[in-house]
């Protein structure tokens, strides 16, 4: 027998290498086999619920890194709440309607040389449904591969008949509250997709446009002109007024081009820009100009000056050309003065017959140059240049949009939703009540809701939920009775293809039998052809899924909505407005937002830049747990960087965490927690110190999970594993675990704490590195078969007050300071070739009183803490290397060669080795006797 055969060396089959790309699918199969999601529901039945409502991703294309970030964050939170003992179900969902799917289907039809016009609406909708379902199934598998646990068997889809039916009922509630109305007002309009757009569908990009100063001749004076500035010359045919601020000062500036009226504060800027010189001959207040008349420069039309609080003095002239059909603020002022929302432009952005002949059929952006030429021709152009400015674009086709007044359905922000409040007021009140993480999200959504226009909910497309209202053919009355909405909702719910029936059935088949107009008694009706905005689709998910849905595990309202910060103007807002309109309450209590993903250099990702990181690639190379770990490396409330150099570093951190678990398992192969667990009071002091440290970790982790600060958990555990454990405690422990007899108190005390560390750290990390935690857990079950069959069925560790010993922690902080100085002295001795290993060292210490007393009390075993062979205290230390301590002031550390010979079993140098022919040190001799091993049996 060799000496190494007498040591308790680690034994485990837990692999050093994770091989996650191959291992993780096995764990997924295990979760499916045991039906983990259902088991969790059974296990947590009757417990307090925690509902995180999933904001539905769009069913188009493969998932990208932003999807992965979002779903992993949700999964971490849900798993944590579940491991806190709550019933935390997760029902994933998909947004299935909308223009991008229509465009993809149209593209596929084009490839097959089929015209969309040759298909009925139902046939086209069927193709859209199939396309959406294909990507729901693709994305479902991709999300599952990330380790997301949820009700994948029964997700919610906005195109399901039951969902569409509930959406129709929600629409009915909104109508019956008097919040919805039909009106003609300017909305964002995409001239390429030929549909209205929501504010949330708008993206801003830089665009080059003409910037022109134009003079409008005053009616009451031969040579006096109002001067306006615009970057949209194409809107001039729709000009029906000029707006001035009532309180601003305006001057009459006499020049060679006539007397020009501009804001006093902008005169110098105007002179500099145009190069015009002259003199101010008169000054008036804006309110003095109200109702003054002027001639349109190229259309035979007289219009007036109106007062507007929206006029600003940032740029231009302080006089704003007013086209109520092409601007939100223009429209508001137009309504105030009874001016029509005139927009002589069709769905494709082409001028129609109400425009001058020379513009008919021309697209708006192409008309700019023609209009500028005309202004020059009639001597109305004062100055022109080209500027680059931020301009709204369609998020789908990336083309610039216009404001265009068209008949649409709106949800009014000023309609009363209860006795005391308008929708805007009630929504703002709820914003105050809801908790926003990070806190500045509250101000963001608050300012958006304060300033937003009425919500345009109608779209002129095919693939969506219809606006289920009827019009009386006899008197024009809009039919919006709740009984009609309920009747249509019932038809949709019970039809295999849901809302398709609206486009297939005759009007009389959609109305209740014998239905008559409440106003005139007429029985002839026509149905609305527009569909609902997709933001209304997803905005009613709180009702269609949580409140009235078919998932008994859910409840309304949600505890948490968690999405990207762009959803303050998207899903958070549409859900808030719909819920407040219908139920006078926000559908959520807390809203948490994350930032966007950037490349390693902090740049936006794009295919053209070649810096896109696909989740699939990371998973294939490194595994999903590395991606999950990436999510918690930084504060995700800010933008978060990703790239393969970063992923490599995270994989290295993962390796250290994994090897720590391997250390635990390897040294617990003979530990039976039911028999070998050492009571706290019998533990060795250093083990009690580590238990106290562990309680701090549990406390920080719990607080950080509660606050959603997952990066704090990652950095806390990373430092604990690399510094406190690997570099200190586990390093010190090796001697005791390997050398002492298997059943000795010294070894069992260490194993007891390793067991506590293993259970606690694995549970804390389970929501984050879910696959690895499960893999570790299955090895833990070999040690204790009584524990739950999955780590995710377990409960988070709680702080054990009995284990907290702050005095002991302070004592060990001081011992660690001494240890730091000793290691520096040994490193110096190593450089001088005096020692190769710390065990070869004898250390003599001179310490200040407080430190000396601490070491003196522990002198019989402190050498193991310092990982040297001998430790002595002296007021005058001498040795081969002598240094002054840095961590402990007024300390001196001397290092010499250790006395005695090296024990071949424990490698510590001791004077008992070789004495009277004894081959090992006294300590090893005692341990071997306990183990019934005779010295003569050893080689």
Swiss-Prot record:
Cysteine disulfide links: none
Chief site of localization: cytoplasm
Cofactor(s), names only, from the UniProt record: Zn(2+)
Pfam family for this entry, one: Anticodon_1
Motif ('HIGH' region): 57-67
SUPFAM superfamilies: Anticodon-binding domain of a subclass of class I aminoacyl-tRNA synthetases (SSF47323), Nucleotidylyl transferase (SSF52374), ValRS/IleRS/LeuRS editing domain (SSF50677)
Family named by the database record: Belongs to the class-I aminoacyl-tRNA synthetase family. IleS type 1 subfamily.
Record protein name field: Isoleucine--tRNA ligase
Species of provenance: Sulfurihydrogenibium sp. (strain YO3AOP1)
Gene field: ileS
């Amino acid at each position: 027998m060799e000496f190494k055969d007498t040591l308790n060396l680690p034994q485990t089959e837990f692999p050093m290498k994770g091989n996650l790309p191959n291992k993780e699918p096995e764990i997924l199969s295990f979760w499916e086999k045991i039906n983990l999601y259902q088991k969790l529901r059974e296990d947590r039945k009757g417990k307090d619920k925690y509902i995180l409502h999933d904001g539905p991703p769009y069913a188009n294309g493969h998932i990208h890194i932003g999807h992965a970030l979002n779903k992993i964050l949700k999964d971490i939170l849900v798993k944590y709440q579940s491991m806190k003992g709550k019933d935390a179900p997760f029902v994933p969902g998909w947004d299935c309607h909308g223009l991008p799917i229509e465009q993809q289907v149209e593209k596929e039809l084009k490839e097959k040389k089929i015209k969309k016009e040759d298909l009925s609406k139902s046939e086209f909708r069927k193709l859209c449904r199939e396309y959406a379902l294909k990507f729901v199934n693709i994305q479902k598998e991709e999300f599952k591969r990330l380790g997301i646990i949820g009700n994948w068997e029964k997700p919610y889809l906005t195109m399901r008949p039951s969902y569409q039916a509930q959406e129709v009922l929600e629409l009915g509630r909104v109508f019956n509250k008097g919040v919805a109305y039909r009106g003609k007002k300017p909305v964002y309009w995409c001239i390429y997709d030929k549909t209205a757009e929501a504010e949330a569908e708008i993206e801003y990009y830089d665009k080059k446009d003409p910037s022109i100063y134009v003079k409008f001749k005053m009616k009451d004076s031969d040579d006096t002109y109002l001067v306006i500035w615009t970057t949209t010359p194409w809107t001039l045919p729709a000009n029906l007024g000029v707006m001035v601020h009532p309180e601003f000062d305006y001057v009459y500036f006499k020049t060679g081009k006539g007397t020009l009226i501009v804001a006093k504060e902008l005169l110098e800027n105007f002179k500099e820009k145009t190069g015009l010189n002259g003199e101010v001959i008169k000054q008036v207040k804006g309110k003095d100009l109200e109702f003054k008349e002027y001639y349109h420069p190229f259309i035979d039309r007289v219009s007036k000056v109106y007062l507007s609080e929206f006029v600003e003095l940032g740029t231009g002239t302080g006089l704003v050309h007013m086209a109520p059909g092409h601007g939100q603020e223009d429209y508001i002022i137009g309504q105030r003065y009874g001016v029509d929302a005139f927009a002589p432009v069709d769905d494709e952005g082409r001028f129609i017959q109400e425009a001058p002949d020379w513009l008919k059929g021309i697209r708006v952006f192409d008309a700019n140059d023609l209009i500028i030429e005309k202004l020059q021709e009639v001597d109305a152009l004062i100055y022109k240049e080209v500027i680059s400015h931020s301009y709204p674009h369609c998020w789908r086709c990336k083309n610039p949009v216009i404001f265009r007044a068209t008949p649409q359905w709106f949800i009014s922000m000023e309609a009363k939703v209860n006795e005391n409040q308008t929708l805007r007021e009630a929504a703002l009140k709820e914003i105050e009540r809801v908790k926003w993480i990070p806190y500045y999200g509250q101000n963001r959504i608050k300012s958006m809701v304060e300033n937003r226009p009425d919500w345009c909910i109608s779209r002129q497309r095919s693939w969506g939920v219809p606006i289920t209202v009827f019009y009386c053919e006899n008197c024009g009355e809009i039919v919006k009775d709740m009984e009609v909405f309920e009747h249509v909702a019932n038809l949709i719910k019970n039809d295999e293809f849901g809302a398709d029936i609206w486009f297939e059935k005759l009007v009389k088949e959609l109305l209740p039998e014998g239905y008559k107009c409440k106003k005139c008694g007429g029985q002839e009706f026509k149905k609305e052809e527009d569909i609902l905005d997709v933001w209304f689709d997803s905005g009613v998910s709180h009702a269609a899924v949580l409140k009235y849905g078919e998932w008994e595990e859910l409840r309304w309202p949600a505890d948490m909505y968690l999405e990207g910060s762009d959803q303050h103007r998207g899903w958070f807002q549409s859900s808030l407005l719909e819920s407040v309109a219908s139920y006078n309450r926000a559908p959520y209590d807390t809203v948490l937002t994350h930032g966007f993903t950037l490349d390693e250099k902090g740049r936006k990702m794009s295919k053209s830049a070649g810096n896109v990181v696909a989740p699939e690639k990371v998973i294939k190379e490194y595994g999903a747990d590395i991606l999950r770990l990436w999510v918690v490396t930084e504060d995700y409330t800010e933008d978060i960087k990703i790239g393969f150099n970063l992923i490599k570093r995270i994989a290295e951190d993962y390796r250290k965490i994994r090897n720590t678990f391997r250390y635990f398992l390897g040294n617990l192969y003979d530990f039976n927690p039911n028999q070998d667990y050492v009571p706290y009071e019998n533990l060795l002091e250093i083990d009690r110190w580590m238990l106290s440290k562990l309680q701090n970790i549990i406390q920080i982790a719990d607080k950080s999970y509660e606050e959603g600060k997952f990066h704090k958990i990652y950095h806390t555990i990373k430092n604990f594993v690399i510094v406190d454990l690997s570099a200190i405690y586990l390093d010190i422990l090796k001697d005791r675990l390997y050398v002492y007899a298997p059943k000795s108190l010294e070894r069992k005390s260490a194993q007891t704490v390793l067991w506590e560390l293993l259970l606690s750290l694995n549970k804390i990390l389970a929501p984050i590195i879910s696959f690895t935690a499960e893999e570790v857990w299955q090895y833990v079950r070999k040690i204790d078969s009584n524990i739950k069959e999955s780590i995710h069925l377990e409960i988070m560790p709680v702080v054990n007050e009995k284990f907290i010993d702050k005095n002991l922690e302070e004592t060990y902080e001081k011992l660690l300071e001494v240890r730091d100085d000793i290691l520096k002295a040994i490193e110096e001795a190593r450089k001088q070739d005096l020692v190769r290993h710390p065990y070869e060292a004898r250390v003599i210490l001179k310490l200040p009183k407080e430190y000396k007393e601490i070491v003196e009390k522990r002198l019989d075993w402190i050498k193991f803490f310092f990982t040297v062979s001998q430790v002595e205290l002296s007021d005058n230390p001498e040795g081969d290397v002598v240094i002054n301590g840095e961590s402990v002031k007024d300390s001196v550390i001397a290092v010499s060669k250790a006395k005695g010979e090296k024990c071949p079993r424990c490698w510590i140098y001791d004077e008992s080795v070789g004495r009277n022919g004894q081959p090992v040190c006294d300590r090893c001799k005692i341990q071997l006797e306990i183990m019934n091993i005779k010295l003569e049996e050893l080689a």
